[in-house]
């Protein structure tokens, strides 16, 4: 410590750094040291021998500082050096740490005018307060207080002083003094019970009964008021029991909201469900909600001194109440979904049963397995009689112009009719002049034929395509196949797929595979029915030529009949009539030529 101060003084005075010389005496197991210091050409010697070299050097530096501080111009400089180094503040802190005490606390007071303030500092250590000389700065006042504290601590009765000391007690080293002061402070702390006088005073004041009236919080005022009334009403009840019961009553009332309610705009008109009313019961004694006022449109206003919020009070607004419980909504959604599923799964047969006639061309797989016997679907006798009468009338002497007009009328009325005709004898497959506009689909796809009368309306979404072919003359060598009637064919969505095959060449036939399911749901992406009319020009026929009946014509799509043998006589009669008409027309042509 003193060595550092002497070195700083030399640096400020622009002197050379001090140099130390040591003298050793005594045996090796107990050596003694004496040091001398050279400061600015002057030599200062330690007053006595010391046990260590470091202590001897510090003693020599202390003697040099004391001598220099007493001299003329250098005295002020030495005093400043000793003051500015803050050595005493460090001494106090180290001593308190060794003694196991709290660190020293400095309190500075400012006084005097503003342009020339004066600071006075006091330091507290081990329950003792020391006041230093005033200073111009706060730092200077703290250093003065530390110097005053250290000087007073050194004057205390020493405890634990070493019995054998090589140095006299008047010239103890600073480290030795620090150890002695630390022991003294520790012994004083033990005698005081480890508590400072201020702590003892605080403890005594806390143990004293307070003469002031206790200030209770506002929220508990009702509790103590009720307790006072309870004492007057029941003087025989012990105060502890009365306090216990009153505390429970206050807790029960505090759990309910005591907030004044203010109506909000846009309050709903429906009554709250019982679950919400159970969660938010009305307050007692402070607010009574009229029956005409909506309870959900009221929100709480928080007063300044409000009690503790209840536990169930959530951050969500109380005005939000669901109209119906959640299970009811889920049940209704299920019902809607089930109704939609029933509407989707409804087959077209039930929807179009009013407009479609029963199918004659349906064949079942079971009939094919049993010796290839085919069955007709049941049809009404009225439709069979109508088809037979229409076949008979068409096989009569009807001119091609009249037949063409009737076909046009049928198409204008918007009815799509499939005329059930008896299959005639098949011509040889090698006839190149016969044209069969066959509508094909892949194997296993469904073909659907439906006939609609003229008066019946047609469903807009029914996937039907009407293929109308005007009568065209065929080679005169085949009198049985003169013209092709108008046929309305309803194709399912599978037939419109891009994988559909191309129509076969002329003169070829292709059987139609009809599965057991005749009706099929139309996808929503299909358009309405389209009518396609194809006309083949007549080259060799004249207007007055009588064409054969439509009943003997080969249909565009061949339908396998279940009983072909029963209709053979009628087909033969139609063939003979057609051949007679053909020969008559050829003779008339020759006569005209």
Curated annotation (Swiss-Prot):
Keyword NADP: no
One Pfam family this sequence matches: dsrm
Alphabetical list of InterPro entries matching this protein: AtDRB-like_DSRM_1 (IPR044450), AtDRB-like_DSRM_2 (IPR044451), dsRBD_dom (IPR014720)
A molecular-function term among this protein's GO annotations: double-stranded RNA binding
Keywords for the protein's UniProt record, in alphabetical order: Repeat, RNA-binding
Bias (Low complexity) ranges: 205-219, 572-586
Signal sequence coordinates: none
Transmembrane annotation, as ranges: none
UniProt-listed CDD domains: DSRM_AtDRB-like_rpt1, DSRM_AtDRB-like_rpt2
Biased composition (Polar residues): 188-197, 378-408
Superkingdom in the source lineage: Eukaryota
Domain DRBM: 1-70, 87-155
Region (Disordered): 188-221, 357-408, 546-593
Functional summary from the UniProt entry: Binds double-stranded RNA.
Name of protein: Double-stranded RNA-binding protein 2
Organism per entry: Oryza sativa subsp. japonica (Rice)
């Amino acid at each position: 410590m003193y060595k550092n101060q002497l070195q700083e003084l030399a640096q400020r005075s622009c002197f050379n750094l001090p140099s130390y010389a040591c003298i050793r005496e005594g045996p090796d197991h107990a050596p003694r040291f004496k040091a001398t210091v050279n400061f600015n050409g002057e030599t200062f010697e330690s007053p006595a021998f010391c046990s260590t070299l470091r202590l001897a050097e510090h003693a020599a530096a202390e003697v040099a500082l004391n001598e220099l501080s007493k001299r003329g111009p250098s005295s002020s400089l030495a005093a400043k050096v000793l003051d500015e180094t803050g050595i005493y503040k460090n001494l106090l802190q180290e001593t308190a740490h060794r003694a196991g005490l709290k660190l020293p606390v400095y309190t500075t007071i400012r006084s005097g005018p503003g342009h020339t303030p004066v600071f006075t500092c006091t330091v507290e250590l081990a329950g003792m307060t020391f006041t230093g000389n005033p200073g111009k700065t706060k730092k200077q006042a703290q250093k003065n207080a530390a110097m005053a504290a250290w000087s007073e601590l050194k004057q205390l009765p020493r405890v634990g002083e070493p019995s054998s000391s090589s140095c006299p007690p008047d010239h103890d080293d600073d480290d030795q003094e620090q150890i002695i002061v630390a022991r003294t402070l520790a012994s004083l702390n033990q005698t005081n019970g480890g508590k400072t006088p201020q702590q003892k005073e605080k403890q005594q004041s806390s143990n004293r009964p307070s003469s002031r009236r206790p200030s209770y919080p506002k929220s508990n005022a009702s509790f103590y008021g009720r307790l006072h009334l309870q004492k007057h009403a029941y003087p025989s009840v012990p105060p502890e029991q009365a306090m216990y019961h009153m505390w429970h009553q206050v807790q029960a009332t505090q759990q309910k909201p005591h907030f004044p309610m203010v109506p909000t705009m846009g309050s709903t008109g429906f009554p709250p469900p019982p679950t919400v009313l159970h969660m938010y019961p009305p307050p007692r004694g402070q607010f009574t909600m009229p029956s005409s006022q909506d309870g959900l449109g009221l929100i709480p206003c928080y007063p300044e001194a409000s009690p503790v919020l209840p536990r169930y009070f959530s951050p969500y607004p109380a005005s939000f109440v669901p109209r119906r419980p959640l299970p009811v909504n889920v049940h209704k959604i299920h019902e809607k979904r089930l109704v939609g599923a029933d509407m989707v799964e409804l087959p077209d047969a039930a929807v179009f049963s009013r407009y479609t006639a029963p199918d004659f061309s349906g064949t079942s797989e079971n009939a094919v397995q049993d010796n290839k016997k085919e069955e007709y679907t049941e049809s009404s006798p009225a439709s069979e009689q109508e088809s037979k009468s229409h076949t008979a009338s068409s096989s009569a002497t009807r001119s091609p112009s009249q037949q063409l007009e009737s076909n046009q009328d049928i198409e204008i009325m918007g009815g799509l009719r499939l005329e059930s005709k008896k299959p005639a004898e098949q011509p040889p497959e090698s006839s190149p002049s016969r044209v069969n506009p066959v509508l094909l689909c892949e194997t296993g796809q469904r073909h659907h034929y439906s006939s609609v009368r003229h008066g019946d309306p047609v469903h807009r979404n029914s996937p039907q395509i009407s293929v109308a072919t005007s009568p065209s003359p065929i080679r005169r060598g085949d009198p049985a196949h003169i013209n092709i009637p108008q046929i309305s064919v309803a194709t399912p969505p599978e037939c419109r797929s891009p994988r559909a095959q191309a129509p076969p060449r002329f003169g070829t036939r292709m059987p139609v595979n009809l599965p057991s399911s005749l009706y099929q749901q139309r996808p929503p992406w299909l358009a309405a029915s389209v009518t396609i009319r194809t006309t083949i020009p007549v080259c060799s026929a004249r207007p007055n030529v009588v064409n054969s009946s439509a009943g003997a014509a080969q249909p565009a799509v061949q339908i396998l009949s279940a009983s072909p043998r029963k209709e053979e006589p009628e087909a033969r009669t139609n063939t003979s009539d057609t051949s007679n008409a053909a020969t008559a027309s050829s003779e008339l042509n020759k006569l005209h030529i």
